[in-house]
Amino acid sequence: MSLVIIGINHKTATVDLREKVAFSPDRIHDAMKSLASRTRTGEAVIVSTCNRTELYCNNAEKEDIIEWLEDYHGLDHNDLMPCIYAYEEQVAVKHLMRVASGLDSLVLGEPQILGQVKQAFVKAKEAGTIALTIDRLFQNTFSVAKKVRTDTEIGAAAVSVAFAAVSMAKHIFSSLSTTKVLLIGAGETIELVAKHLKDNGVASMVVANRTIERAQAMCEEFNATAITLEQIPDFLPKADIVISSTASPLPILGKGMVEKALKQRRHQPMLLVDIAVPRDIEAEVGELDDAFLYTVDDLHSIIEQNMASRKEAAEQAELITEDQSHIFMEWIRSLESVDSIREYRSQSLAIKDELVERALNKLSQGSDSEQVILELANRLTNRLIHSPTQALTSASRQGDLNTLGQLRSALGLDKN
């Protein structure tokens, strides 16, 4: 086997180059077929995300795969080579396991990459570029990634502002199934917050934005209600949680507006998380008895603590991937022994069939049966021990005691 991984990622290449080597979804099927034609067993998988492009091939030469990548995208060899990494055999196996486990990600331990690797595997199956070795490699990798998630705390701590905001809400309210959330803004961060809230089964969401159309587009995906910023005073009293992230140069929520809303809520507590810079919520809101205001700085301190926790978990995860990559390579070596055993058995059976046919012919011609059987036994013995005898003789003549010992052990000569 010659398992090869060729790739570039956020650590080795700029976004400009990563864009040039990326594979669009509509071309990935044909690309994998083309790549597989450069391997001896037709096995290839392409993982292409915003942060990495990696080519996984079995029974291939890395030089051929790099040449294919250059030809496919029309890239200059000198531009690509400084950014390329190439791994083979066990190092390649461990790399894939690390990638799927989030150990090689921009955000340590992020879970999205596992889904992206799984999607690439499914696409390769659809393209017909999966066979025994690559199939087993990816299936094992998915199991390893799951083991890393369950046996370590690598995914337990929030390391993004959006995730940290929702984690704080979960910590304060314990369950989000009965809470109502007001999201202010409709940008990428708020969209990610909405996704995390939906995943955690929040009761309802309202999205307020300066342009109602942008809020409506986001609300369709998350089954939320869209409102304008001017409508916030009407919806604020119903909100248990407020999370805000706009690009407004001035605060969206003032102390007076929040104080009025709290009175209407009969002083039920309200969590407000301001992840905007400059701030969307006046700092004085935090002075109100029933308002619990947190800023982006509060979240960053949580994220820093959690990142340290993830790094500790990553050390455990590295041991898991190291161990599991060795186990996979043992399976690969066992395949090689299976092929050798099959060839040896086939060779021996061919000798047997040849000599039995000769013996039967002699018997049909009236030869003495006892003599025919003795001749068959002698010929069969000589043919079967010919190769081992030559190997023993050669090792002896060369003084190769190590090989001689292995041969004696394999032939059972050292048994008492």
Swiss-Prot record:
The active site is at C50. NADP(+) binds at G185, A186, G187, E188, T189, I190. PROSITE patterns: GLUTR (PS00747). GO terms for molecular function: glutamyl-tRNA reductase activity; NADP binding. Signal peptide: none annotated. The record marks H95 as: Important for activity. It catalyses: (S)-4-amino-5-oxopentanoate + tRNA(Glu) + NADP(+) = L-glutamyl-tRNA(Glu) + NADPH + H(+). Disulfide bonds: none annotated. Keywords: NADP, Oxidoreductase, Porphyrin biosynthesis. During catalysis, the active site Cys acts as a nucleophile attacking the alpha-carbonyl group of tRNA-bound glutamate with the formation of a thioester intermediate between enzyme and glutamate, and the concomitant release of tRNA(Glu). The thioester intermediate is finally reduced by direct hydride transfer from NADPH, to form the product GSA. Belongs to the glutamyl-tRNA reductase family. This is Glutamyl-tRNA reductase. It comes from Shewanella frigidimarina (strain NCIMB 400). The lineage of its organism: Bacteria, Pseudomonadati, Pseudomonadota, Gammaproteobacteria, Alteromonadales. The gene is hemA.
